[in-house]
Design a protein with these regions (language model features):
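Bacterial N-terminal signal peptides that target proteins for export
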Residues: 1-11
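Sequence context surrounding c-type heme c attachment/ligation sites in exported
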Residues: 24-57, 74, 78-179
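Short, structured beta-strand/loop micro-motifs enriched in basic residues and often containing a Trp
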Residues: 57-68
């Protein structure tokens, strides 16, 4: 059996620095439509749960990765933050009225779309200034795992009025729930 000397703290720091440079310096900025659905997103903390959208006949579940979870109301969401939103159809009765459960909330039906919203330095810079949402990019997916034909400019236009809230809907509600 051959024993190798243990790595010195200095060698470990140098290796970590080189690894960081190699993984961050070469990664090109993401563009709309390029974000994949993270395989483990359902294990992430919920940003908001069972968001009721009777106007859209939808129920939404919104997850955030741990990086986004560490955000603060005063500082916004940092680079590396990712949100995943599942949009479900609200179940409807035969007469077209929406079903509600014993709690008075809409009942989830079929999954319609999975949207991903991610933020990192330099992302979204290819977007025309009037629709740019800081460093956020968007992607839409079908329940089958195929890319959805949705135009991400629709996402951008919806989030654009929220520039003071880091372009995130229900920002205040989320941070109020953490106090």
């Amino acid at each position: 059996m051959t024993l190798r000397p243990a790595a010195t703290p200095l060698a470990m720091l140098a290796a970590a620095a080189l690894w960081g440079c190699a993984t961050t310096a070469t990664a090109p900025p993401m563009k709309d439509g390029e974000l994949q659905v993270p395989a483990d997103y359902k294990s992430w903390p919920k940003f908001l749960s069972a968001v009721q959208r009777p106007d859209a006949k939808q129920v939404r579940e919104i997850y955030m990765n741990p990086m986004a979870r560490n955000a603060s109301a005063s500082g916004g969401f940092g680079n590396g933050g990712v949100f995943v939103m599942e949009n479900f159809a609200a179940k409807a009765r035969a007469d077209g009225t929406l079903e509600t459960g014993a709690d008075g909330k809409l009942v989830k039906g079929d999954l319609l779309r999975v949207f991903v919203m991610g933020k990192n330095a330099g992302w979204g810079q290819d977007v025309a200034e009037p629709l740019r949402n800081g460093n956020w990019v968007y992607a839409a997916w079908l329940p089958s795992g195929q890319k959805a034909p949705d135009d991400t400019n629709t996402c951008r236009a919806c989030h654009l009025p929220l520039s003071g809230k880091d372009f995130v809907h229900r920002y205040d509600e989320h941070f109020a729930s953490r106090q």
